[in-house]
Amino acid sequence: MKLIFSQTITLANAQPIKVTLGEDTQVLDEVVVTALGIKRATKALSYNVQEVKGDELTAVKDANFMNSLSGKVAGVQINSGATGAGGATRVVMRGMKSLTKDNNALYVIDGVPIFNTGKSGGEGLFGEMGGSDAVADLNPDDIASISMMTGPSAAALYGSAAANGVVLITTKKGQTEKTTITVSNSTTFSKAYIMPDMQNRYGTSSGLFSWGELANRRYNPSDFFETGSNVINSVALSTGNTKNQTYLSASTTNSGGILPNNSYNRYNFTARNTTHFLNDKLTLDIGAQYIVQNNKNMVSQGQYYNPLPSLYLFPRGDNFDEIRLYERYNTNYGYMEQYWPYGDASLSLQNPYWIQNRINR
């Protein structure tokens, strides 16, 4: 490789020429946030750090902003929960590290590790209902950046809890000598994308290996699903001077899943104030968040409490509209009971509409 620098100079009176290369300084270092909000150049770190700016999270908003990281960070797997709107998300860095323990990364918000209690629902016959997680409660418009930290050195910063990596979240502060009011809205819709291709020509029979009579009805499992929606509204105020900066925000998240009666609603209120004392030698940074969250009817991942097995195994040729009225009055006992005339009355399957309206509260 050759580096060639050329410059033409007119000689006068054959005087001696002194050649000096001019200085051209360019900033090539990328600065990222490490532990406790300390900023360091990427090349100065002994561990891998990848950063995602907050603007990348708000291009297409999700009820759980962690889903917006999918495909944006190399070597990081974002596993979205199958529990419906607002479901928990698992972050796995550089592959699975344990067969028996949790492989999820540690979450750190503004230097403070948080206890993430999210669950995606159990497996097996009686798998329980899934839920949301603590980090999903954050307002994506309040996030300045997210840094992904992996390697043993990252674990040394936060202890054994960070053995699977660290998701370091830095929230926004007030601006200096500038006042900004930001109002945003994000509205998205979702539908079931791929459905199983089933035959509707023949119905069922009493035998295991024979077709039934010609079916006179067509049943499509997609009739059970609905059009999901996710609406996020946010307003933020950022102001301040060289000594004091203030950030205030409020947001609402209203999300409906593609399954009946599945919803996720969240309301965020954030306040943060940063004050500098003693010629910027002392900084007082105070922040508070008030969050109200309510999720309803997240999908169970087992068989007995999951509406999907009974939906896909519904007998071909039978009238699916009959089970939409999922409860019937039992005159012998004097109360409403589930209507599901299929199976052997043991712990097998249940009416999918009854599950979504009576079990998964």
Give residue ranges: language-model regions.
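Short, glycine-/polar-rich solvent-exposed loops and beta-turns at beta-strand/coil boundaries
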Residues: 10-15, 79-87, 158-163, 262-265, ...
